[in-house]
Amino acid sequence: SNAYTKYHMNEVKVFYQKEDMWDVAHQIYGTKEKQMSSSFFIFNLPGEKKAEFINMIPFTPKSKQNMTAIMMARNDGDEYGKLVVYKFPKNKTVYGPMQVEAQIDQNSEIAKEFSLWNSSGTTYKRGDMFIIPVNNSIMYVEPVYLEASNQAIPEVKRVIVAYGDKIAYASTLD
């Protein structure tokens, strides 16, 4: 996927002038920003009749935070190894993972809870963010773990879901 950040360009001029470079999207993992790893899903690709096992990675424009594309690697049967790339229109802003992370940080209820957890002898850590295409849009799902200072095993405390401009969080997805 790192090679694709440069080699997705089809026009010679755009390629040589590096006008459309991409980055693999970033997220907050634990408490620090890092490049996202690919996620594995069982998912119905658009136009396909049955769900299949896919590997997915999101891209943002170089040094920007909005999402520009998602690459999916197919892993089932005759489709094994085929790559499918969904590019978002340049005239439509699709929030990238770090923009969603910022929305989470700006949510007063969530921020209050994070503060409380950090001051009571425990620390919260964000897990891997999942990016799920839904109805021509993107839904983000991120688990939040609570880790006691004397315990090595973190506990899932909340699940945050973001869709469009809306953010919800609860102890489960139910």
Predicted regions and their residues:
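Accessory, solvent-exposed terminal regions and/or long lumenal/extracellular loops of proteins
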Residues: 1-174
